[in-house]
Amino acid sequence: MSTEITHHQAMINGYRMHYVTAGSGYPLVLLHGWPQSWYEWRNVIPALAEQFTVIAPDLRGLGDSEKPMTGFDKRTMATDVRELVSHLGYDKVGVIGHDWGGSVAFYFAYDNRDLVERLFILDMIPGLIKAGDSFPIPVALMINHIFFHGGNPDWATALISKDVNLYLRRFLTTLDYNYSPNVFSEEDIAEYVRVNSLPGSIRSGCQWYATGLREDTENLAKATDKLTIPVIAWGGSHFLGDIRPAWQEVAENVEGGAVENCGHFVPEEKPQFVIDTALKFFAPLR
């Protein structure tokens, strides 16, 4: 079975989506967060591809996908993923989502219960908050970048775009999010700077956050019919920690916990943990 990573493009929901595939067998869909792309799964894909077909898109507006002006709420982005899976001809999939990709994964599973059979979440909750609820001050301080990016996305876009390298270098190496400052190599940082320097990319990313504070809160408040598929939810011990309680609000069958000595970027900080956990969790689907 091949572990070669192949790049593709397809017209999905009216825009050009870039995605990669590898391996063969039962399909697993890997959904990245911000400021990342399919590349965040680079250390995970080869091992998973030995037993599964791996599909890792650049989600709407990020990576090498096109940058549309609208559609950045996570429910719409989940329809992008559904259309990609349909384009590829699959009728059953397992899903792994990290960061905002975890929220997209939630709506993908929630709205497509006959399609998604298992859900693996990494350091993300279903949505930032339900409409009408309030952020506890300690949580708001920990995730303060969310309010910078999403509170006034046009202003944030203008400021970040002045020096994408400076901003992302700080974002990716600070101990605010990582257990270690050495998670990302210079090559890794350069790749994330490259894709986030493409025209429209920073705007798209800030819109991910803006909708997270607006449309997504309304959608989450309406998501009252719990998932019944198996869900595992693991947060980094030095960022969100044990995220099971948040997922138990939207799913009946949740396991997981906190990944020790790990921050937010779990697929890149602890790739072997992700590999081992995914292979065990998705094994019944093979």
Swiss-Prot record:
GO biological process, one term: catabolic process
EC number: 3.3.2.10
Active-site residue numbers: D99, Y209, H264
Record protein name field: Soluble epoxide hydrolase
Subunit and partners: Homotetramer.
Keywords: Aromatic hydrocarbons catabolism, Cell membrane, Cytoplasm, Hydrolase, Membrane
Localization per record: Cytoplasm; Cell membrane
Lineage, highest ranks first: Bacteria, Bacillati, Actinomycetota, Actinomycetes, Mycobacteriales
Gene Ontology annotations for the cellular component aspect, listed alphabetically: cytoplasm; plasma membrane
Principal location class: cytoplasm
A molecular function (GO) term: epoxide hydrolase activity
Membrane topology qualifier: Peripheral membrane protein
Family listed: Belongs to the AB hydrolase superfamily. Epoxide hydrolase family.
Protein function: Involved in catabolic degradation of epoxides. Shows highest activity towards C6 and C7 carbocyclic epoxides. Also active towards linear 1,2-epoxyalkanes.
